[in-house]
């Protein structure tokens, strides 16, 4: 097939396939919101007076050249061509990538621990992104009012806060209704970006010289240290690139690639080159290149459209924070939290009240503290560059250990991408004192909390195993001399089907009865995002009406007792009458001690997190009137 015929076939597929078109438009509305709103502040920050770069046509050409080649190398080549191939059963993102590479490492090895900690730290840095993106995006959009009417400058922060508070308040109701508008609105946004850029570009076509990397390299050589500092601002055009990989599970790789190459990238390039062209004809426009390239009669409509686009970009990272936390809960790094489903049709649309309110408080605090988008720009890059470096490293491990690529090729690609990522990372490190400390502090705090929970759970399991009684011999002895049997079914939720659940021991001790049918139900999280219903359940009959029922779940799924029992009835013929079934749960009270483990204060922190996590009955969606909670104390 020739190149022309291949292109024609691809275009024909896109035009004739309505489902692909819908996915592409959906991806444009969700995946590209962050990177699509970068033109609001990226070039403005590159020409910040603090960088000390003398304004000149060569500086404009050099910076625009760096913007173009950064976008081409990092987004188009690294993410779209290579990283998006590293999917975990169709899912992307640093946690999915971590789960994928951990399959190739020996369990409990030092290498596995390094890979796990890298993945978790990369995920934690996303929380910094989830705080800064809404703040800088909405703030930079509303700042357009200052250009339209300088007298409105004192209202910028109040308007920004009203928009952001409203955005977080509507999360509890879900966004399925307004979410249908996200795609069309963002299509209008990108087309507008492209047209604005084209309008300015034709007035100074010499900006097209910036396609030549010579100008970018010359700029770096001529300005050395100042140019290196500017790289931290150039990186702002790449914020949101990770979303192409993270949201791959929602839309698929093909629609995201279509959206990027057909609409998003061309429009972004046109806009950045248009801003550069405007600066060649109007050097004073460096104050706010985006809004000063807009014809004056269109300024207010542009502020409105930009605000809509930034709200959509903010929604994407908020939803991403909910999804990331849900995955971390299933992987055992975060305490159970109450999860609400906001759409009956879309399983991915969830709402976590605790995360929502934490984000709201932090976002409001950031807007009030930093006041201007240019102040936030210094804080923005460090969170994203950290995640990018980790993603590149883990992707290289996948290339070598999973795909079995030639070591020389992996080294060449891995080092090339890492060199670019580390250059941006180092440039952003120079801004730690100016605001970069904030996402680092936020990400490090989240990492510390997640690792404390993970380590505490390991200690708790170890103590339970030390004191545990082997289940099958115990049941055999119990059935040989059975206590009084009562009608109904008892379901004992347990994390370890090898040992007798503490809840069963307490029930026998205090009630001295055994139900006519006993089921030990265990939920097991696997290293894949979803588990097919055909492979979800396994059952072992211990005789005497006693069963071990294991239910496998992916790390993007939330266990649901109702669905498991329905599935057991359909697939295994195990009939459950909910009102005749009692669910026994052990409620552990963690007691910090001087036993080997964590430091006392970390054990106390873990005990507090354990106490304040969602009740198992709430998390597993069990009717409250069918639950029997039996308390037990465990020293760690």
Swiss-Prot record:
Membrane topology per record: Multi-pass membrane protein
Q: Name one GO cellular component term.
A: plasma membrane
The GO terms this record gives for MF are: potassium ion transmembrane transporter activity; symporter activity
TM regions (residue ranges)? 23-43, 63-83, 114-134, 150-170, 182-202, 217-237, 260-280, 298-318, 350-370, 379-399, 407-427, 432-452
Record's signal peptide: none
Q: Which InterPro entries match?
A: K+_transporter (IPR003855), K_trans_C (IPR053952), K_trans_N (IPR053951), Kup (IPR023051)
The UniProt keywords, alphabetically, are: Cell inner membrane, Cell membrane, Ion transport, Membrane, Potassium, Potassium transport, Symport, Transmembrane, Transmembrane helix, Transport
Query: So what does this thing catalyse?
Result: K(+)(in) + H(+)(in) = K(+)(out) + H(+)(out)
Q: Where in the cell is it found?
A: Cell inner membrane
Which protein family is named in the record?
A: Belongs to the HAK/KUP transporter (TC 2.A.72) family.
Q: What does this protein do?
A: Transport of potassium into the cell. Likely operates as a K(+):H(+) symporter.
Q: What is this protein called?
A: Probable potassium transport system protein Kup
């Amino acid at each position: 097939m020739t190149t022309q015929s291949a292109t024609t076939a691809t275009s024909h597929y896109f035009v004739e396939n309505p489902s692909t078109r819908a996915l592409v438009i959906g991806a444009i509305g969700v995946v590209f919101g962050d990177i699509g709103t970068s033109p609001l502040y990226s070039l403005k920050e590159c020409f910040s007076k603090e960088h000390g770069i003398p304004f000149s046509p060569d500086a404009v050409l050099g910076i625009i050249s760096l913007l173009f080649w950064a976008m081409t190398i990092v987004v188009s080549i690294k993410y779209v061509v290579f990283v998006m191939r590293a999917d975990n059963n169709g899912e992307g993102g640093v946690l999915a990538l971590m789960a994928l590479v951990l399959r190739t490492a020996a369990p409990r090895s030092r290498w596995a621990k390094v890979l796990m900690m890298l993945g978790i730290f990369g995920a934690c840095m996303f929380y910094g992104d989830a705080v800064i993106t809404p703040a800088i995006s909405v703030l930079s959009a509303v700042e357009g009012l200052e250009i339209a009417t300088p007298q409105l400058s004192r209202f910028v922060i109040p308007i920004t806060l009203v928009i952001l508070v409203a955005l977080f308040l509507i999360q509890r109701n879900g966004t399925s209704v307004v979410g249908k508008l996200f795609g069309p609105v963002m299509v209008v946004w990108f087309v507008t970006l492209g047209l604005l850029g084209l309008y300015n570009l034709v007035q100074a076509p010499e900006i097209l010289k910036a396609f030549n990397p010579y100008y970018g390299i010359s700029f770096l050589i001529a300005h050395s240290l100042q140019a290196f500092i500017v790289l931290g601002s150039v990186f702002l055009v790449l914020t949101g690139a990770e979303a192409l990989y993270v949201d791959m599970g929602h839309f698929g790789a093909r629609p995201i690639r279509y959206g990027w190459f057909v609409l998003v990238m061309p429009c972004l390039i046109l806009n950045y080159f248009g801003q550069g062209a405007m600066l060649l004809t109007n050097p004073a426009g460096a104050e706010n290149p985006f809004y000063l390239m807009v014809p004056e009669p269109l300024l207010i409509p542009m502020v409105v459209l930009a605000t809509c686009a930034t709200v959509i970009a903010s929604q994407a990272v908020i939803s991403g924070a909910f999804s990331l936390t849900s995955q971390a809960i299933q992987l055992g790094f975060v305490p159970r939290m109450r999860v609400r489903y906001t759409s009956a049709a879309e399983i991915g649309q969830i709402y976590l009240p605790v995360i929502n309110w934490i984000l709201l408080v932090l976002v409001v605090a950031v807007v009030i503290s930093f006041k201007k988008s240019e102040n936030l720009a210094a804080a923005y890059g460090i969170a994203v560059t950290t995640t990018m470096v980790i993603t590149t490293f883990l992707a290289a491990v996948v290339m070598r250990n999973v795909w079995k690529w030639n070591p020389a090729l992996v080294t060449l690609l891995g080092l090339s991408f890492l060199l670019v990522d580390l250059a941006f990372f180092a440039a952003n490190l120079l801004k730690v004192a100016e605001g970069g400390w904030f996402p680092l502090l936020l990400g490090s705090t989240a990492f510390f909390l997640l690792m404390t929970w993970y380590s505490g759970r390991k200690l708790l399991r170890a103590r339970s195993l030390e004191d545990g009684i082997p289940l099958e011999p115990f049941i055999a002895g119990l059935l040989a001399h059975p206590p009084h049997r009562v009608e109904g079914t008892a379901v004992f939720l347990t994390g370890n089907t090898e040992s007798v659940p503490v809840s069963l021991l307490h029930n026998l001790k205090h009630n001295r009865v055994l139900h006519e049918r006993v089921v030990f139900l265990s939920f097991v999280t696997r290293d894949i995002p979803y588990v097919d219903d055909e492979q979800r359940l396994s059952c072992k009959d211990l005789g005497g009406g006693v069963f071990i029922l294991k239910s496998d779940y992916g790390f993007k799924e939330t266990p649901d007792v109702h669905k498991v029992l329905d599935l057991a009835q359909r697939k295994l013929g195990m009939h459950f009458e909910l009102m005749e079934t009692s669910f026994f749960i052990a409620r552990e009270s963690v007691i910090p001690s001087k036993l080997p483990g964590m430091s006392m204060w970390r054990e106390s922190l873990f005990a507090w997190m354990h106490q304040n996590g969602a009740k198992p009955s709430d998390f597993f969606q069990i009717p409250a009137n069918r639950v029997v909670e039996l308390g037990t104390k465990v020293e760690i």
